[in-house]
């Protein structure tokens, strides 16, 4: 059985589909991936996770091999099986069609013959999932001898192991996937050391022995032609390249760029590793005995299974003791001690099958397959163990065996691992999933397999306001091409109902925020057991975090960036919240650098993006506001005069110089070329000539400042023409003029445009970030001249009534449509400006990534992160102690896994014996007068309130005059709020959140206290 497809010699990569993956991997890596054939043996939950991720990643072909009939227990984690297939259909055949539907570019086959040597030779990579050890050893021996990359992986309850054998002399072409470090040079000494100093804004991230190349160095220009040079680091800003005494002295400019070196690694067969205990990859630095014990433990359960024809029985102490005895004989060193508790846990759950572990091990394995076929990133070398014992029931050993026995349910794999009691709790949970994108799809799949919300009292709410785009299909696996433009939340909900028809799921398309609190109200939040964020923006994350703190709900938080991922669990009254610790804001590009002194392609791309926004969106929006909003002109008076003049001038130009046909759009584009890439550069050089020196005698054009060169328009230059084509077509769209894509027509018309000669102006140009911009000088001076010019323009503008119904089409930037000229314009504009400043240009792909702020994304990372989130969810359900929870920081590329205990909620002291955290508050139940409120806090809590507020409304203060104070003391808090805020209290809410400033009545000291939740309704 197979899916037919046309196989080309070099497969064409669908940039629109693989867009986010390409930013994590590169086109070169994708070419290798799309030429790779993979065999996956074992199609239960672990195997299907690997297959799903590889299919979405776009390998050439995946062959499925598993002739065993579907069992009911498989449905614990195999999301492409149905109850109707149990006992009737082979596993590979049962999931074939649904795997086919994942990606039209990937060939899917089912093999129902034998795993013969000739058959295995067809594949670049062979993966064995949850297979007997004897088969692992046999297939690995053949693969190693025949240079076929081999991976075996298995999960047993909360335990997992993964083994890689990529053969001898395996070449890693890129160990970490990061862009090579590049630095701007400040100076190079002419001596024996040859010390290179980079500009101060940067910090070296180079190590001794790294190789670097030079370019654009002036003076010591011979460095530009040298092969990669080995360096020795000296300080955070300097390194040595050796003797430069025979080279001319350095004068200016130049970049130094890290050269990535390939790394060659040898892999040994599985038999050797099991015998020697070598090449164990550590996954958790705090679990010192885990590798020793699980190396023996996994072999022991396989030996037990080989002898008894079944894995150890669930929670069976007799079987566990037998496994312990086998494991003792497998310890490598005389002083090794067996952790009998760990081996018992492994034996108890050896038949366990939980979707979080399948997601984690499956995602990691799929990433290892991609490493094997591409050489991109560092593989696990060679044997790795994983466990999540912290999520097992605390009293596991003392619970009765009956609690863990299968009941003929689709959740049997989970019951074997955690017991029936916990399974019942999971099914009756109410959870709110915020976001149905990549992580959201994985979470919904995990919820469906776990049965979360599938019980009579259970429910999953999911919201996402976005619709499905083609680029989503590569990693948001619940969507198909037929779903494009459909709502994500509803489509995802429909998809997981197919996976588990018992799942109770409600889909919404409302964003979360203050404006939707009438929907996501107190009743809604009070009905929840917890919230899971699957968001891609900090603002929404912070909002949901604040709501979870207010309502006292657990929050599961996560994020990904390429191969990197992180998770955080927020537990009421136990941990800090998401907003308690945040990353510093990203450093922006200084305005003067952007406008006048770019030195990197990122600067020119951002300038081009801003230019696009100004020309095709802001101008149109301003015109439309002028024509439709009577108060618009008045509102402009609040802006500084320089900005107001600029805005009015653009409105005048947009209305009075509006094009009537496409030829006029071409003429406008040609004049814009002259303005941006010739006149503005001529003006800059007029103000700051190339030979200019500063007051200290150093050249003005040095360090990060690169002297630009004006461009002379050449109608035969493809880049010049690309700008004209894109700019003219966007201008035409603004004005509703029919587009033109005939290059010859545009070329001919552009060549005939009459362009005025450049005349320099007397203007001040900002030269550093610390220097005030010209516009702020104007504002400080009063801006009288600008005011007069504004009045003149206003008198010349047509009245809105004269142009009733007229509108300019505003263009909203859309990065993922290759036909709309948006990225074409930004790429051409950026590269022309880069040419001005002798900066290496960027292709469309790189430009799109930077201009569109595209976050690199991989389905493998997403799957692993969602798995780790669900492990924490299982702990939350059991109310685990703080030390049992883990925040995860990982990078599948290096690879690295870090697990740390969440930070406890900080305690604030009011007085001896009385502390509070962000989770605490005062509760006042019932609407009372201000006097009663003040008395309550004085008598009950010993707090003398000096100030009371609600949001921005001050309700009470000690300094209020006596008469006003007496009037307010008699008023109820609700009445007081409505009177002072001039807003009615919402009828659908019950509470106000009040803030108080107060003193301790015993000591008179100011004290910090929690908020007050005041029930008025």
Curated annotation (Swiss-Prot):
User: Reaction catalysed?
Assistant: ATP + ubiquitin + [E1 ubiquitin-activating enzyme]-L-cysteine = AMP + diphosphate + S-ubiquitinyl-[E1 ubiquitin-activating enzyme]-L-cysteine
Name the Gene Ontology molecular function terms of this record: ATP binding; ubiquitin activating enzyme activity
In the record, biological process GO terms are: DNA damage response; protein ubiquitination; ubiquitin-dependent protein catabolic process
The EC category is ligase
Protein biosynthesis recorded as keyword: no
- Read off the PANTHER family from this record: SUMO-ACTIVATING ENZYME SUBUNIT 1, UBIQUITIN-ACTIVATING ENZYME E1
Please, what other remarks does the record include?
Answer: There are two active sites within the E1 molecule, allowing it to accommodate two ubiquitin moieties at a time, with a new ubiquitin forming an adenylate intermediate as the previous one is transferred to the thiol site.
What's the protein called, per UniProt?
Ubiquitin-like modifier-activating enzyme 1
């Amino acid at each position: 059985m197979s899916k037919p497809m046309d196989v080309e010699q070099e497969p064409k990569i669908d940039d629109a589909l693989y867009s986010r993956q390409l930013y994590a991997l590169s086109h070169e890596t994708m070419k290798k991936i799309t030429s790779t054939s993979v065999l996956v043996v074992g199609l239960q939950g672990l195997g299907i996770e690997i297959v799903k991720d590889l299919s979405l990643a776009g390998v050439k072909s995946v062959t499925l091999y598993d002739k065993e009939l579907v069992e009911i227990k498989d449905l614990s984690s195999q999301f492409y099986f149905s109850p109707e297939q149990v006992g009737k259909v082979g596993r590979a055949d049962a999931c074939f069609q649904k795997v086919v539907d994942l990606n039209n570019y990937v060939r899917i086959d089912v093999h129902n013959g034998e795993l013969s040597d000739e058959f295995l030779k067809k594949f670049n990579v062979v993966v064995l999932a949850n297979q007997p050890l004897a088969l692992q050893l046999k297939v690995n021996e053949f693969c190693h001898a025949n240079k076929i990359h081999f991976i075996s992986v298995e999960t047993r309850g909360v335990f997992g192991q993964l083994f890689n054998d990529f053969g001898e002399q395996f070449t890693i072409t890129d160990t970490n996937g990061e862009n090579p470090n590049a630095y701007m040079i400040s100076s190079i000494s002419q001596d024996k050391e040859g010390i290179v100093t980079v500009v101060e804004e940067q910090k070296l991230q180079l190590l001794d022995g790294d190789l670097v190349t030079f370019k654009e160095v002036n003076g010591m220009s011979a460095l530009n032609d040298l092969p990669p040079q080995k360096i020795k680091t000296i300080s955070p800003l300097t390194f040595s390249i050796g003797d430069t005494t025979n080279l001319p002295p350095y004068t200016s400019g130049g970049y130094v760029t890290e050269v990535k070196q390939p790394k060659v690694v040898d892999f040994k067969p599985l038999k050797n590793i099991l015998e020697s205990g070598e090449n164990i990859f550590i996954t958790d630095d705090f679990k010192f005995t885990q590798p020793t014990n699980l190396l023996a433990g996994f072999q022991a359960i396989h030996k037990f299974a080989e002898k008894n024809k079944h894995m150890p029985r669930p929670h069976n102490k007799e079987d566990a003791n037998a496994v312990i005895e086998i494991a003792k004989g497998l310890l490598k060193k005389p002083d090794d001690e067996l952790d009998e508790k760990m081996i018992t846990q492994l034996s108890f759950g050896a038949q366990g099958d939980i979707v979080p572990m399948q997601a984690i091990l499956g995602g990691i394995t799929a990433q290892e397959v991609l490493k094997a076929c591409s050489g991109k990133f560092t593989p696990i070398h060679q044997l790795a163990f994983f466990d999540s014992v912290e999520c097992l029931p605390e009293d596991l050993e003392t619970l009765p065996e009956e609690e863990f026995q299968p009941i003929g349910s689709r959740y049997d794999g989970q019951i074997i691992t955690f017991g029936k009691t916990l399974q019942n709790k999971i099914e009756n949970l109410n959870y709110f999933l915020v976001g149905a994108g990549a992580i959201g799809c994985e979470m919904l799949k995990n919820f469906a397999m776990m049965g979360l919300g599938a019980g009579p009292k259970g429910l999953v709410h999911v919201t996402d306001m976005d619709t499905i785009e083609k680029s989503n299909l590569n990693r948001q696996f619940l969507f198909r091409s037929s779903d494009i433009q459909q709502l994500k939340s509803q489509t995802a909900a429909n998809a997981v109902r197919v996976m588990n028809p018992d799942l109770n799921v409600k889909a919404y398309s409302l964003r979360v925020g203050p404006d939707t609190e009438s929907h996501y109200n107190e009743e809604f939040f009070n009905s929840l057991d917890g919230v899971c964020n699957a968001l891609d923006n900090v603002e929404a994350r912070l909002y949901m975090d604040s709501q979870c703190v207010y309502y006292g709900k657990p929050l599961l938080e996560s994020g990904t960036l390429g191969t990197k991922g992180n998770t955080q669990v927020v537990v009421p009254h136990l941990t800090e919240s998401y907003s308690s610790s945040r990353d510093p804001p990203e450093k922006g590009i200084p305005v003067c650098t952007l406008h006048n002194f770019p030195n990197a392609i990122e600067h020119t791309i951002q300038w081009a993006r801003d230019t696009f926004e100004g020309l095709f969106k802001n101008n149109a929006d301003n015109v439309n506001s002028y024509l439709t909003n009577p108060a618009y002109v008045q509102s402009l008076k609040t802006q500084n005069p320089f900005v107001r003049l600029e805005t009015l001038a653009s409105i005048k130009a947009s209305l009075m110089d509006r094009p009537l046909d496409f030829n006029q759009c071409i003429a406008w584009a040609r004049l814009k070329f002259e303005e941006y890439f010739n006149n503005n550069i001529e003006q800059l050089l007029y103000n700051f000539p190339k030979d200019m020196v500063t007051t200290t005698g150093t050249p003005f054009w040095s360090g990060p400042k690169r002297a630009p060169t004006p461009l002379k328009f050449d109608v035969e230059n493809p880049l010049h023409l690309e700008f004209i084509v894109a700019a003219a077509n966007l201008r035409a769209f603004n004005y509703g003029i029919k587009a033109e894509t005939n290059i010859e027509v545009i070329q001919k018309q552009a060549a005939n445009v009459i362009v005025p000669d450049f005349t320099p102006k007397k203007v001040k140009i900002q030269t550093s970030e610390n220097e005030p911009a010209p516009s702020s000088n104007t504002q400080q001076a009063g801006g009288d001249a600008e005011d007069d010019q504004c009045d003149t323009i206003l008198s010349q503008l047509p009245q809105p009534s004269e142009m009733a119904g007229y509108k300019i089409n505003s263009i909203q930037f859309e990065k993922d449509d290759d036909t709309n000229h948006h990225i074409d314009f930004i790429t051409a504009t950026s590269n022309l400006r880069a040419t001005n400043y002798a900066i290496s240009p960027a292709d469309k792909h790189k430009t799109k990534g930077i201009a569109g702020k595209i976050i690199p994304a991989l389905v493998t990372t997403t799957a692993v992160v969602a798995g780790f989130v669900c492990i924490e969810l299982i702990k939350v359900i059991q109310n685990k102690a703080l030390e049992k929870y883990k925040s995860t920081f990982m990078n599948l590329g290096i690879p690295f896994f870090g697990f740390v205990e969440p930070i406890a909620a900080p305690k604030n002291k009011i007085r001896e014996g009385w502390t509070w955290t962000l989770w605490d508050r005062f509760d006042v139940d019932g609407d009372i007068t201000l006097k009663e409120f003040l008395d309550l806090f004085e008598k009950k809590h010993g707090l003398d309130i000096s100030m009371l507020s609600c949001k921005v409304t001050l309700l009470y203060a000690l300094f209020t005059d006596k008469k006003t104070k007496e009037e307010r003391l008699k008023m109820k808090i609700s009445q007081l709020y409505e009177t002072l805020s001039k807003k009615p209290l919402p009828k659908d809410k019950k509470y106000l959140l009040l803030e108080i400033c107060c003193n301790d009545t015993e000591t008179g000291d100011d004290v910090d206290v929690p908020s007050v939740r005041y029930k008025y309704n």
